Amino acid sequence: VLEELGIEVVAVTDAQSDAVKEVDQLETALALNPDALLSMPYDVEVTKAAYQKYIDAEIPVVFMENASADFTAGEDYVAVTNSDSYGNGMFAAMLLAESIGYEGKVAMVYYDADFFTTNERDRGFRETIEKYYPDIEIVAESGFTSIDVVGTVADGLFAQYPDIDGVYASWDIPATSVITSARAIGREDLKVTGVDLGDDSTYMIADQDMYVGASCPKAVETGKIEGYALACALIGKEIPTYLCSSVQPVSYDNVLEAYKSCFGIDAPDAVKEAWEAHQ
């Protein structure tokens, strides 16, 4: 979208979920004198001062997924763009409920941080289970603050609830760590759901493995919304301060179509081969 509109991208950064690193990257990018900023704050408090420098310089800011702390929409920043985070959690709950026969005990392994996207996913999962599946009990909610500790968190969960039927994780990477821990104690029958489609998690869905399904944001759709929001910011066009794209449930039955819908490209060959092996 940005290329089509003739907008030059002067910097692309990836802080890899490290808020301190993100602050350094934001300050480096500011030195390039950009006309607008599109950014996702990993920690709303840690990054606040860095974003304030853009606001003080009257550089329009469009946030992705999460707004930094204490800023006012439409005044300090243009808008927040996001996928339907609550819907992601809802679909993950529906998929997990179906996979365990609509009864049993499940747990949540969630990202324990002030991060709107995952907070809403988790709320969507919890409220959907509690409202629509009376025979399913959420017996534990185990939080993590770093991907590196998910395995340890999962080990503790399984030690306390060795016969649990299913686990929801805030996204697919911690879900794979949960699966690794479950395999280590012989729980290949455990059902796991989450959000997002990485190559590993997509393969597991196609292979009818322990990751039985996920909800997936439509990345192409979300990217277009972000691009147009940034363009509107550059020309001073007023837009809604919250822009949301759609999501979809993904299971074995639709994983190939869903992957293309989400990312705009065909699923990797390995995923196709795994899916075809079960036909």
Model features per residue range: what roles?
Residues 1-279:
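A residue-level marker of the well-folded mature domains of exported/periplasmic proteins
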